[in-house]
Amino acid sequence: MSKLTEYTRYADAQQHADSRALWDLFDGDRERLNIAHECILRHATSDGRTAVRIAHADGADETLSFDTIAAGSARFAHWLEQSGIEPGDRIAFMLEPSLPFYLSLFGAMLRGAISVPLFTLFGLDGLRLRVDDCKPKLLITNREKAGIAEQLEGVRVIIADAGFENLIPKHLVYY
């Protein structure tokens, strides 16, 4: 049987679609599946292939490779582990799409934590409501939103600006 991704016509894919065959597309299985591995790590082949293109509001474009995201996510996962974050803990992040956003998202997943992305336009009340609901161990945000985030009780706030990567450079680039 061919893999679903081998069909080039929609009609063929529809005809041969089978939910059981979808598992053939993943490295993991029903018992062990890590979304960070499936989305990023298995595509990091040291060839610099583009994973994400970000169009910023100021007109600048940013390109992130699978290799960059994989290495940074692994370092961040190690940092989370050394910081006492356990599988199942929640990590909230209120960031625009950027390298820190993707490192937070996939690094938390790689660690086995639950990634909780938050809308960047939340004010104090909206943010408090979400944080009180999900009880994250960490809230990662930018300097602009740090003042709001630091008013919340019971959550450690990490500022993900240009120095964000300085938290994680000493850690291994695989997890």
Predicted regions and their residues:
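Structural core segment of the AMP-binding/adenylate-forming
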Residues: S2, Q82, F106, L110-Y175
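Adenylate-forming
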Residues: I40-H43, I69, S73, I91, ...
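Residue-level preference for short coil/turn positions at secondary-structure junctions
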Residues: S46-G48, P87, K135, E153
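Conserved AMP-binding/adenylate-forming core of the ANL superfamily
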Residues: G48-F106, G123-R128, V173-Y175
